Amino acid sequence: MASKYGLTAFTVQEATNGATYYTYKSENLTLNGTAAQTTSSWTNQPAKEVVLFAPAGTIDDDAITINLKVNGAYGDNIVVNFDNLPFTIKGLLVEAVKLTGGSGDDDVITVLSFH
């Protein structure tokens, strides 16, 4: 494991294959028809892997729309059925996650990010 922080914290191979994580964050987002976004800023340390899952008994809708912030801008929408959770995103350096879904009642999605 690395003894320092920042871009040079890991060996070249660890940094290249993206398989080493320095830390992780977990955040619950409540979806009720409006967009919910991760509150913590990941710009200085983007997530190498993001996992979305729903705690038991919290989902009653059909789909969720995911929007990822990569390189300072949000990209296209990704639509995922709740039946497909947990959902893992790898291979991108994600700075933030925005989720839309729900139709009045509160649906809770947990965003687990590895940095």
Place the predicted regions along the sequence by residue.
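Noncatalytic modules at the cell exterior or secretory-pathway interfaces
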Residues: 48-50, 89-107
